[in-house]
């Protein structure tokens, strides 16, 4: 009896913040700056474990649950948005090798998606700054997801597969955050982790195909 052929990898799905773009450290600095006037701090480790890879909506909810800030959700969003615009206006660095990898994959016929918890305007602005928006065949952003279904839920990667016209078995995810790793694992898509702010905890490392 002939064996079944394994699915052929045809699609690569990228996270953005902390993987392609060096923005997670900026987000950490934003949250630290927001908390400091009220006498609170957040460690880099706690930021990476609690906030990295998640939507701003989820993160603002978590911030207000963890810290007794005299701010409404709307005020918190507004302050973070204003501070981030100042940071991003100064320019954000691409991760080393990111543009070269995207170019290689494009030239070799892979379908490429961006699956980011960011909002579209913010992401497009950053991608256009580096001239890499055209490398992607599909985009999925945080606001595209059902309420409460951002990472670590699998929806963002399953939608990316649908947009690319591929299956989870034919895709590969590149991620840096634990939330993203769990989302890919739950979607039954192999995931490579490229750590940014910290190395994934053992439970998340076990979900990856490899840690680079």
Where would I find each of the regions flagged by the language model?
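Substrate-recognition element of Asp-dependent hydrolases with the DxDx(T/V) motif
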Residues: 31, 98-127, 184
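Substrate-recognition "cap/lid" segment bordering the active-site pocket of phosphatases
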Residues: 119-172, 178, 182, 186, ...
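Short acidic-hydrophobic, aromatic-tinged amphipathic segments that line or gate anion-handling sites
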Residues: 210-212
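Short glycine/proline-centered loop/turn elements that form peptide/ligand docking sites
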Residues: 99-100, 104, 177-180, 191, ...
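Alpha-helical substrate-recognition element adjacent to the catalytic core
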Residues: 37-68, 73
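Active-site neighborhood of HAD-like aspartate-dependent phosphohydrolases
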Residues: 2-49, 186, 200
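Conserved SAM-binding loop
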Residues: 20, 94, 112, 173-174
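Metal-dependent phosphoesterase signature
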Residues: 62-100, 108
